[in-house]
Amino acid sequence: MSTKVKISEQVSAMFQKKLPKKCSDPGMFTIPCTIGGVKVKRAMLDLFASINVMPYSLYETLKLGPLRETSVVIQLADRSNTYPRGVIEDVLVELDKLVFLAHFYVIFMNHDEYATSILLGRPF
């Protein structure tokens, strides 16, 4: 059974409009920040992450005091697991003129000058 539907000129014009140009994927969203006087050029913001992560090498540079032990297991994007060396609490993170307190899980990472070294989760 077929039915005919009468369409006005206005509706017809809406269907004829072209779709907007598709934007390219910007990759990851990064911003500069300062932690303990150390400038981090590219901190990755991940709105789906519920934790903040920093590499052990940066933790050593910052001299933020002893790590608190943790039993947390972090599952990475490739579904592998990593075990943080510990957590450091109440770290001042400066984003432009805003200052936040954040907890960071400290993990061992291979150094790569082109990779982001900090992951900032949902609180940012």
Feature locations, PLM:
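Proline- and glycine-rich low-complexity segments
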Residues: 1-124
